[in-house]
Design a protein with these regions (language model features):
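Charged, compositionally biased, marginally structured helical/coil segments
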Residues: 1-149
């Protein structure tokens, strides 16, 4: 079952259970999928990687909005955004541990032959491909900078 199909099935379940927070989050995902499909053109389909990137983008937007609401002293809106982000995160693959992230980034650094922080771009490109969907770009960047020193 593709991610788009899971979202459609969960949308129906959320409507039946009258869960407003889930319904809003899942509708946002479905809308984003439809928007991406319309941009690709007729007769095309989204790849699993594209679907994951869309969900990651939605989660990141919700988390950033929650931080803004929190800084503006609007806890009720912040809680809503966090709840939606948590619902959307269920569609993402499990995050990898810090030790696993370190191991993968070290392997990428060896493979690319990076020696200093000036090789950051080369390492980041390879690391993002390898860790797509498993770790956040900020986490990967921080780990690469830490290891390159």
């Amino acid at each position: 079952m593709s991610l788009t199909e899971r979202v459609a099935a969960d949308l129906i379940n959320a409507m039946k259970s009258k869960d407003k927070v889930s319904l809003e989050a899942i509708r946002a995902a479905k809308t984003a999928f439809l928007l991406a499909l319309s941009e690709k053109g007729p007769g095309s389909a989204l790849t699993e990687e594209e679907e994951l990137k869309i969900i990651q983008k939605l989660v990141r937007q919700r988390r950033e909005s929650a931080e803004i609401y929190k800084s503006q002293n609007r806890p009720e809106l912040s809680e809503k955004e966090v709840a939606e982000a948590d619902i959307l995160e269920k569609y993402l693959p499990a995050k990898i541990s810090d030790e696993e992230l370190t191991r993968v980034v070290k392997a990428v650094i060896e493979k690319t032959g990076a020696k200093s922080i000036s090789d950051l771009g080369k390492v980041m490109g390879a690391a993002m491909k390898e860790l797509s969907g498993k770790a956040d770009g900020k986490e990967i960047s921080a780990k690469v900078k830490q290891l390159l020193g």
